[in-house]
């Protein structure tokens, strides 16, 4: 990512956020303020996909180059922000995801944490359970809990939907 590019951090929440999330945003703001554009936030409940669409619409009203969608119960250390920004490229890698885990029922007493990175398979998208830590690699799909997207991708999606 070009050093002059600005990143807007966007999140959806019901009116409150996790303390760890808030603290990680404070740390980012204190140490990387020159990289950050305006924060975008959608407050409310309901269908999360609709909230994320409203978030994208709000982001596209800013002048920022990148949107970093964050789940409001996640934490983003400054070092992880730096890795995402370093890996991103507006043409070669316009979408970069940080690794986030979700919990799924497995029939065991406790939910199984599953990485929200996926490979396409005949039976559908399957979670990738084996990956090199601290590396950048291509996936077929990723969750939106920590997703960095270049403006051009979102503009193209908007324009093609109209």
Each predicted region: which residue ranges?
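N-proximal low-complexity "stem/linker" segments adjacent to membrane-targeting elements
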Residues: 1-46, 50
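Local beta-strand N-terminus motif with an aromatic residue
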Residues: 7, 64, 92-93
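Polar low-complexity intrinsically disordered regions
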Residues: 11-12, 45, 73, 82-87
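Residue-level marker for beta-strand->alpha-helix junctions and adjacent short loops that shape enzyme
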Residues: 14-16, 74, 101-103
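Active-site nucleotide-sugar/metal-binding loop of Leloir-type enzymes
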Residues: 53-66
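Conserved catalytic core of nucleotide-sugar-dependent glycosyltransferases
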Residues: 56, 77-162
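Short beta-strand-to-loop acidic/aromatic patch adjacent to the donor-nucleotide binding site
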Residues: 64-75
